[in-house]
Amino acid sequence: MIVTVTANPSVDRTIGLPHALARGEVQRAVAVTAQPGGKGINVARVVHGAGLGTVAVLPAGAADPLLTQLAAVGLPHRAVSIDEPVRTNVTLAEPDGTTTKINEPGAELSAGDLARLTDLVAEAAADARWVALCGSLPPGVPADWYAEVTARLHAGGRRVAVDTSGPPLLAIAQARPDLLKPNAFELAELVGGDGARLEAAAAEGDLE
């Protein structure tokens, strides 16, 4: 069993445009899709598709469209109820493949919301081998929350993987998760250096 945690989930809407985006003009969409999003949910979707046990843990109100979408695709999930709606992220897709992304900050979690989410993660992880803490943290959540959750999970004998960036990445590194997944730019945040140079070196097979 792999439990995924998405503290800042989203409904991801993609709007297809008939031509290049023109600022300041009215443009009509040629296609619109919406699906549940957030890094942890995406990981759970892949794990579930591979036929392995998984459950996605997240904050969302009982009537939130995100939970309806998760149920529609048959993805196992457990949610802590919150008052604010889950954020909507919008991608504007042009015919040549160019995309413009607009991401909302997310629903603010109160101290009570966060405490209940932390408890639910620990409860869901009772039968798990791995817990994946994924994505950004929403407003109201301290940068060291992933580190706090990791310590609690380690105390229960669970293995923890983390995929995040910015201040939460810097904080979690000190908690020594079992797996940390930075890209080149995030690795540069941790160890210093130039992310673009690290990425170019990796692309060329130069790992020194």
Language-model segments: residues:
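Conserved N-terminal subdomain of the carbohydrate kinase-like
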Residues: 23, 48-129
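Short, acidic/turn-prone active-site loops that include or flank metal/cofactor-
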Residues: 9, 30-33, 84, 105-107, ...
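Short acidic, glycine-rich surface-loop motifs adjacent to enzyme active sites
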Residues: 125-140
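Conserved phosphate/ATP/ADP-binding segment of small-molecule kinases
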Residues: 144-160, 164-208
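Glycine-rich phosphate/adenosyl-contacting loop at the front of the ribokinase-like
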Residues: 1-55
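Cofactor-binding loop segments of dinucleotide-utilizing enzymes, especially the Rossmann-like FAD-
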Residues: 5-9, 59-61, 82, 136, ...
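General beta-strand structural signal in soluble alpha/beta enzymes
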Residues: 5, 78-79, 132-133, 160-164, ...
